Amino acid sequence: MTQLDSLRSMTVVVADTGDIEAIKQYQPQDATTNPSLILSASALPQYAPLIDDAIAYAKTKSDCPRQQLVDAEDKLAVNIGLEILKIIPGRISTEVDARLSYDTQATIEKARKLIKLYNEAGIENHRILIKIASTWQGIRAAEVLEKEGINCNLTLLFSEAQARACAEAGVYLISPFVGRILDWHKANTGRQDYPAAEDPGVISVTQIYNYYKQHNYKTVVMGASFRNVDEIIELAGCDRLTISPTLLSHLQAREGELVRKLAFSGELKDRPQPLTESEFYWQHNSDPMAVAKLAEGICKFAEDQEKLEKMLLERL
């Protein structure tokens, strides 16, 4: 048995890529995309027809160049999602423009638009997750969307405050980041060597997983952003793990049965009162790593969105 097969026996394996060939190879249940992955996928020759289709679509919708650009990038993200849905049995995560991360209403409207594009292509809501950054405003948007039957994946999650607020909002799924937490600790503590069990990102996801199970929250925990296979092995048993093709290939190449590391068997506890906005900011901002990584993550996704726009503009 490969380690990948062993992992699949206890955790839903998700592919963190927009590369259709990689998805075919590893046969994940679900797939996740983001602006950075859409940008790199768009450079692959097999995606050219999807880009052409997105541009043709945008031109039928508006004469305004700015609106055409917005429509083209939304349609391209959905087109890539549609191709991926042909080869996975589960859900695709498609991300809202990161530049809307602090605007609740704009996030809601963008999510509805993406869902409408999927619906028009014959895809029902139960196969889609709308990815939103885990800002206070993003979490409030997700709360509204969940009530409309639009399931959300709250990403760029680094703090306990973010995790708690997501569960309290009834969000379908969260993506707590592992590797980026490790990156911050390596850069800021001077320590470079972390065994997987002491990896701060692994510890963070483990704590969130246990908190959710302890308080009987239904929100799915999907560990994300891995730097090495050992982090993944240390989180075997997590609800879901979204993994890059490179690390999926390492797991597939290694034989052996994994030990389940995450499994809650303790007593259930009463849920606390939901966090207020001020409590959320106080707790989240008390964690300098979470503050830095959330801001950096949003900026990086926004930067790649702008690169994607530049590429589309040249074709419009």
UniProtKB/Swiss-Prot annotation:
Q: Which GO terms describe its cellular component?
A: cytosol
One MF term in the entry's GO annotations: transaldolase activity
Pathway(s) per entry: Carbohydrate degradation; pentose phosphate pathway; D-glyceraldehyde 3-phosphate and beta-D-fructose 6-phosphate from D-ribose 5-phosphate and D-xylulose 5-phosphate (non-oxidative stage): step 2/3
Database matches in InterPro entries: Aldolase_TIM, TAL/FSA, Transaldolase_1, Transaldolase_AS
Which top class of enzyme applies to this chain? transferase
Q: Which reaction does it catalyse?
A: D-sedoheptulose 7-phosphate + D-glyceraldehyde 3-phosphate = D-erythrose 4-phosphate + beta-D-fructose 6-phosphate
* Cell location: Cytoplasm
Q: Which Enzyme Commission number(s) are on file for it?
A: 2.2.1.2
Q: Which residues form the active site?
A: K131 (schiff-base intermediate with substrate)
Swiss-Prot/TrEMBL keywords: Cytoplasm, Pentose shunt, Schiff base, Transferase
Q: Which GO terms describe its biological process?
A: carbohydrate metabolic process; pentose-phosphate shunt
Q: Which family does it belong to?
A: Belongs to the transaldolase family. Type 1 subfamily.
Record note on quaternary structure: Homodimer.
Q: What does this protein do?
A: Transaldolase is important for the balance of metabolites in the pentose-phosphate pathway.
| Official protein name in the record | Transaldolase B
**Lineage, highest ranks first:** Bacteria, Pseudomonadati, Pseudomonadota, Gammaproteobacteria, Pasteurellales
User: What gene codes for this chain?
Assistant: talB
